[in-house]
Amino acid sequence: MFLIVGLGNPGNEYENTRHNIGFKVIDNIAKEYNIEINRQKFKGMYGEGFINGKKVMLLKPTTYMNLSGESVREVVDFYNLNNDEILVIYDDISLEVGKLRIREKGSAGGHNGIKSIIAHLNSEIFSRIKVGVGQPNGDLVKHVLGKFTKEETAILSESIEASTKAAAEIIKNDVKTAMNQFNGFKASTTV
């Protein structure tokens, strides 16, 4: 089984914030592959289904961002998963809105959700799709917990769709293939 985790914060007040783009991508994957995210366990909401004939679990941790690793660890332990069966999708402030970056491993880069996952897995080796949410002009917390502008929202729909395709490519083939295909991605709509 392959675990696909989208990072975000639970609660309506965070629903359309930059920090919750991982949840948005998971919702899009669920819609695309008819997977219902309607079960609660592992400190998260999840659903199981198939992508390209391979069994997957879509997980949205409900622990708040900084504790996401607790949820991921519970799934990994329960299903005895290896790190190469984990894909994490999350926001990246170092990328402009409309860009993606796929990686096989790496540091947290200041992202507290990834920091938590690395700590709970005791490893930086797991694949990830980073979705650009733009650089903050001032306060970082206000930026990541802020909502997207109308223009950015139009661009984001392309990023979400590309992230969905990239996740499917990782499941079907591998991370390197997805990197070659999507690391140069830039939404055609611009701000």
Swiss-Prot record:
One of its GO terms (molecular function) is peptidyl-tRNA hydrolase activity. The record marks D91 as: Stabilizes the basic form of H active site to accept a proton. The record marks N9 as: Discriminates between blocked and unblocked aminoacyl-tRNA. Its main location: cytoplasm. Keywords: Cytoplasm, Hydrolase, RNA-binding, tRNA-binding. The keyword Flavoprotein does not apply. GO terms for biological process: protein quality control for misfolded or incompletely synthesized proteins; rescue of stalled ribosome. The keyword Protein biosynthesis does not apply. TRNA binds at Y14, Y64, N66, N112. The active site is at H19. InterPro entries: Pept_tRNA_hydro (IPR001328), Pept_tRNA_hydro_CS (IPR018171), Pept_tRNA_hydro_sf (IPR036416). SUPFAM superfamilies: Peptidyl-tRNA hydrolase-like. It catalyses: an N-acyl-L-alpha-aminoacyl-tRNA + H2O = an N-acyl-L-amino acid + a tRNA + H(+). CDD domains: PTH. Monomer. Hydrolyzes ribosome-free peptidyl-tRNAs (with 1 or more amino acids incorporated), which drop off the ribosome during protein synthesis, or as a result of ribosome stalling. PANTHER family: PEPTIDYL-TRNA HYDROLASE (PTHR17224:SF1). HAMAP family: Pept_tRNA_hydro_bact. Belongs to the PTH family. This is Peptidyl-tRNA hydrolase. It comes from Clostridium beijerinckii (strain ATCC 51743 / NCIMB 8052).
